[in-house]
Each structure stands twice: as C-alpha cells, then as structure tokens.
Regions:
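Divalent metal-binding segments
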Residues: 2-9, 13, 17-284, 299-344
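Accessory "access/gating" subregions that flank catalytic or transport cores
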Residues: 291-294
C-alpha cells in the first residue's frame, strides 16, 4: 500500500449503519482504507507513512450521489440549441430563461422565424414540456407561425419532435406513411408529431448535422459533468448509448471521461433497439468487446429496453383514466411480445 492521506472533517456521513457518522477518512491509491476518527485508524497510521489533510476540517462530507438515468452527452448537445422549456436551463453559453406557457413558446418561435436571414434553414429548438406548458404543440399551430420556414421542436424529455409542414416534408413522411409513432389528427391528417425513438430518429435525420455538431459531444460531456458535481453527483448511468452512434458516443466518452480531472464515473447502457438493429445476432459479442475496453471510470453495464414512452412528454402508456387530454400514451417501437423474446437468454 502506498502512502495514506487522511482527510478530517467536521462531520462525514457514511452509508454504514454501524458507523453512520465519522470525522476522518483515510485514502490510499484512490481507495478508502478506513472511515472513523483519527483514533480509530491508528492501527493503520502507526504502521504506514501518512499525511493529515485538514482542508475539509470545517466542512461536512458525504458519499457522492448516483444518478441512475442520465443522457449527459445528448442533453449537453441539446443545450446548444434554442431553448423553449419551462425551467431555467444552465447551458454552456449561460442561463437560458424559461417560458411559462405554450403561448409564450409560440411567441418565441415567431421571434426566431422573424430573426432568421435564411428561410431554408430550420428553426431548431428543444425543451418543450407539454405537461407544464399547457398541452402539446401541433402542425397547424406551427404552420400559423410559418408555413415556409421549417420549424423543429424537441420535447424536454426527448420522446417527441413537433414539426410544421415544411419540416414535415423534409422528413420524407407522407399521408401514406404507416410507421410507428407518426402522429395524426382525429381526421387522419398528419399532425406533425414524431413520437418515440424510431419516429424521433426520422424527424432528426434532416437536421442531424445541426443538432449533433462536430466536436460538441465532448464539450457537452465536460459541461454536464460540472453540473453533476455541483449537485453532489459522482456516478451516472447513460441510459441511451447508441441513440446517435455507438462509435462516436463511445469515442467522445473515452476521450473525456478518462482524463484525470474528469469528476465522474459513467456506466454506458446501450439502447437495445439500436443495438439489435445494428448488430443483430452479434450484439452480445459487440458488447463484450466494448466492455473489455472499459476502465475504472468508464464501463459498459446492462441493456436498456424501452416498452413505452415518457411521463413528462405524456407518451408513457397509462391505464384508465389516462391523461387529461384523453390520450393514454404509446407503446414503444418494439412489440412487447417480441421484446420479451429478445430479453430471454
């Protein structure tokens, strides 16, 4: 064992019911040797060289929090877009003000359309929350803002994209399209909704170079890591690896997470529908090969199956009485019986 460093504090909260509170913690080689008091760890300190570090003597320490469901790279990337959400967004460029209602969002979208000097370039926004801002957007609402400039709005929980007619036309979706997650009005017309991962992918393809800008993935990770640490989080699981690209996402994480000063451990959990779609019967072999490349700070863990939507986006599948607008949500793109079969060993 290398030299021990002992950090003292006013109080240290532990996760050990036998010793829930301590006043010192001994570390060596990046691992905990002992938690207790300077007196209780004397058996170690008498035998091994050590230093006492009292920089935290007036502070209260606690274990780092674990966030089991994040999308740091994805979320950080979206923060580079125009924001139309209901709470303040702490983007890399600075705090972005919230919009309280759907009407306020429509006003903001109109401002963005009027400010553009390129009517061929889509207005790309993110953060809309139908539950908090007064209900869903739709094609007719967005067409009333502009029926010439393409408008693309991603929900805060990114399970829905809302589009106007010019943007809808760029996706290639027509009235004859029968793909899962393509929204329609009660009369059968396309309503500009793209619901859940497959449909969101369809809506994103025409703007993918604007959403996932080159080099922004690593910058997004660095920014989101700062946000996490400011809130006491030290370990996260990315529950959507592969949504954009397995290779690009992994490379960005490897380049950033393993830097000595990067403050998080990240567990990468692949999105099963993308994994199966790309690798098929070789999916498990691919995961094993990627797991072998993992490090202490970046590892592969589990597989994510999505069977329905998102509660904030009001696409989560509900039984009676459903949502206030009468909808009951949507199943995922993979039929449930098929999903169960793919879960089995």
């Amino acid at each position: 064992m290398e030299r021990i460093t002992v950090y003292t504090a006013q109080r240290i909260y532990t996760m050990d019911p036998g010793r829930p509170v301590a006043s010192a913690i001994a570390i060596s080689e990046g691992r905990i040797v002992s938690v207790g008091s300077l007196e209780s760890m004397q058996p170690w300190l008498r035998r091994l060289p050590h230093d006492i570090d009292d920089r935290f003597k007036d502070d209260i320490l606690m274990p780092g929090f674990i966030d089991p469901h994040t999308h740091l790279r994805m979320s950080g990337t979206y923060m580079g877009l125009h924001y139309v959400g209901p709470i303040t967004s702490h983007a890399p460029s600075g705090p972005q003000a919230p919009l309280a209602s759907r009407d306020a969002v429509l006003v903001r979208l109109k401002e963005l359309v009027e400010a553009t000097n390129d009517p061929e370039r889509p207005i790309i926004t993110w953060g809309y929350d139908p539950g908090m801002q007064g209900g869903h957007l739709d094609r007719d609402m967005l067409d009333a803002i502009s029926d010439t400039v393409p408008i693309w709005v991603l929900a805060y929980a990114p399970h829905i994209v809302y589009t106007n007619t010019p943007m809808l036309e760029r996706t290639g979706v027509t009235e004859d399209t029968t793909a899962h997650g393509i929204g329609r009005y009660p009369d059968g017309r396309l309503n500009g909704w793209f619901i859940e991962t497959s449909a969101v992918g369809t809506a994103t393809r025409p703007v993918i170079k604007d959403v996932y800008r080159p080099g922004f993935g690593q910058e997004a990770l660095l920014h989101q890591a700062k946000v996490a640490v400011q809130n006491g989080v030290t370990t996260v699981a990315d529950m959507g690896w592969g949504f954009e690209s397995f290779e690009r996402e992994w490379d960005d994480h490897m380049a950033v997470v393993n830097q000595p000063d990067f403050p998080l451990r990240i567990l990468m959990t692949p999105f099963e529908a993308r994994l199966n779609g790309k690798y098929g019967d070789d999916a498990l072999d691919y995961l094993k090969s990627m797991a072998s490349q993992g490090t202490d700070k970046l590892s592969v863990h589990g597989v994510k199956f999505i069977n329905d939507g998102s509660y904030p986006s009001m696409t989560l599948r509900l039984n009676f009485p459903g949502y206030l607008d009468g909808e009951v949500g949507l199943t995922g793109e993979t039929p449930w019986a098929e999903m169960v079969a793919r879960m089995l060993p």
